[in-house]
Structure formats: structure tokens, C-alpha cells
């Protein structure tokens, strides 16, 4: 069936648009996400038109009332435009004209869909950035709570996924806190570059009407306006920057997820999953699966794909606006939804879904040679060149492995046979708690440093 719904631009054309092209061209199925922002932007535009005398105050009030009625209809579920409306902007304008008559046709004076959609996306993303930043803080708070409770809980630290040195569990958790802090700060910087108004740039070259762009920007809470209309309608740097920041958030969540998956396995056994945040198997009744971190790890690739897609979308576009830019919205919308969903899920998982198995952690830091570096440090502190000490300890580890002993199991005679500088205090030096406490350099895992790091983290949350 041929679609005969009249388009705002259709008087230039003869006949009707092919139904397949109507469907292909339409964005209403996804850009309806912008409707609240489109209405807000249009209200500001109507007020600006009245302020500058382009329309009367009475006309502006009719437009504002009509737009607010559409907002209520949408919230009540009574405004559900179909693909014949093409996009959210045309759908709103058509409904507005139905509500207020011909004055509705004046709303688009001194405005193009090009600057209109750019305004909508910025308003949308501005809100979403603030919401995500709040979610990051909630995530950080859960990490901080665990850190405060586990300053002196020890856990193996790894390099190459091989046990390296024991560390404070709080130190490990605070590493993710700092990653999240950078994410929070990065989004704040992107917010500033998003908070610039393109409204009034027109299709590409501005307008002949005596508009006041700074006034409409002020009404919408924008801090600046674009100084070049071509740039204003074609810029999507802010969206790419957001997806880049979103990708980094997902990198951090995915890394933590990978560790949660490993730690929940029988091979590690560092955490237990609560029933509220784990699932079972359809065939193996003994299973408790870490679906939440697995899904977060998987969804990271989805956000990375949106970033790559946006870069490829933009790389070949000549100035100014091109229909290709319709493809930016689904990437932005899904990127936002995915990041928010993953942040919420991981916050719940950390807050309610895991229990640290402290007995197992204590065993893990005492059952290997992760205190070997401290033996080398012990000798170096007694004047033995570090590299010489390092080589000696390597031989000690090799000998101990062959005899089935850990370093703590060697007798003092065995130690002194290896080097005369070993004394009885070697056992204190290689005890797990002392190994951790001794690393008291700024930013290290020493308990004194971790207590200070916890306080700094508290202050960061309080100031943000």
C-alpha cells in the first residue's frame, strides 16, 4: 500500500514516497527517545521567537501550551506516532498543528531539523551524563565500603595471572575506585563540551531572522553557543567522546567482572555468590553461575562497537549535515542504556551478591612463594647488592620447590647456609602481614598507606 501521509517537504515532489523508502527513511521508532528534549527545545525556541518579535507573545503561549499538552499525552501513553511521521520532530509539529491550528506551523521559523536534532541530542546526552556520573559514585561507594572493611584482609596480587606479591584486599578494590574516579572526571569534561547550543544555526548557514541564540541557550541551560553554524549542525565530537568514555567505563567493569568470575571459581574460591545474584544450570544441578559479570564482560564489546561505528560514520562526511547522521542516535542510545545497566548490575553484585571468603584468602597468601621478593629486599637492606640477592633467592625458591618446602618452612640453619646475613628475624620479614605492611611507600599496599587511601577516597566522594 502506498503511504500518502503528507510530508512537510512534499510540495516539491510529485506522487507518494515508496512504502519501502518510507520505512527505510524513518527514525521515529528510535528517535522518539528524544521527545521530551525535543519539546523542551521547541518551548525555548518559541519563547525566543516571541522575545525577538518574530511571533507575538500570544502565539508563543499557544505554542508552549500545545507542546506541554503533547508532553502530557506522551507521558500518558496517548501520543504514539507511527513511521508515516518520519521522525520525532515532524510528529511533534504535526500534532502541535492539530492542537493549536495554523500557529503551530510558525514554530519552525528560523530553525532547521539540523540544528533542532543537534540540540535534542545534546540535551539528552547532558542528562544521561549526569545520571551516569551519579551511578559511578554509587559504584564507588560500594567499593569503598568493602575497602574500609578489608584494609587488613590479604589477597594474592598477580602479574601475568601468576601470584606475585600479597596485597591488601582494600588496595585491590581501591584500584577500581580510582578507575571509576577517572571515569567520573572524564564525563565531567565531556559534559562541558556537550553543553554548547547549536540552536539557531539553521540548516547550515544561520538565518535571516533577528534571533537571539544566547537567550534560547540560556533557557536550555547551555553555557555557550556554537560560533560557526556549519560546525554546529555537523559536530558529533561530543557523541564520540561520550562513547569513548563509555567504552573506558566498560573496560573497567569488564576487568572487574573477569576477576569476579575467576574469584568465584573453585580454582580460586576467593568469593561466594549469593543466590540473589547468581543463576543455575538447566542440566547440572550443582552449578551456581556468575551470569552478571559474564554479561557485563560481553556487553563491553557492544559499546566498543558503537564507538567504532561512530568513528567510521563521521570519517567521510563533508560539511555540513548529511542523512548519515541519523545513524548516530541508536549508537548513543544503546551505549547509554548499556553502560547504565552494567553499572547498576555491578553495583548490586558488589553490594549484595558477593561474600569474601577470608579463610580461603588467608590460605592463598601463605601457600606459595609470593614473599620471595621480601627475602631479596631483606638481604639488600643488609648490604647485599639487590641483583645478587635476587639471584640467590631464585636458587632458594628452586631448592625449596625440589624439597617440597615453602620459604617459611626452611630452618635458620638452611637460611644461613645460603647466606650468612640471614638471621632469626627473616621469619618476621616474610610473614604475609609484614610483607604487606612493609610496602609503605605512597600509593603502596602497606596498611598505613591504605588507611590514608581510604580517607582520600572518602574525600573524593564528598567533594564530587
Swiss-Prot record:
The keyword Lyase applies. Disulfide bonds: none annotated. CDD domains: Argininosuccinate_lyase. Transmembrane segments: none annotated. The keyword Protease does not apply. It catalyses: 2-(N(omega)-L-arginino)succinate = fumarate + L-arginine. GO terms for biological process: arginine biosynthetic process via ornithine; L-arginine biosynthetic process. GO terms for cellular component: cytosol. PROSITE patterns: FUMARATE_LYASES. It is an enzyme of class 4 (lyase). One of its GO terms (molecular function) is argininosuccinate lyase activity. It comes from the Bacteria. Keywords: Amino-acid biosynthesis, Arginine biosynthesis, Cytoplasm, Lyase. It is found in: Cytoplasm. Pathway: Amino-acid biosynthesis; L-arginine biosynthesis; L-arginine from L-ornithine and carbamoyl phosphate: step 3/3. Pfam families: ASL_C2, Lyase_1. Its main location: cytoplasm. InterPro entries: Arg_succ_lyase_C, Argininosuccinate_lyase, Fumarase/histidase_N, Fumarate_lyase_CS, Fumarate_lyase_fam, Fumarate_lyase_N, L-Aspartase-like. NCBIfam families: argH. Belongs to the lyase 1 family. Argininosuccinate lyase subfamily. This is Argininosuccinate lyase. It comes from Crocosphaera subtropica (strain ATCC 51142 / BH68) (Cyanothece sp. (strain ATCC 51142)). The lineage of its organism: Bacteria, Bacillati, Cyanobacteriota, Cyanophyceae, Oscillatoriophycideae. The gene is argH.
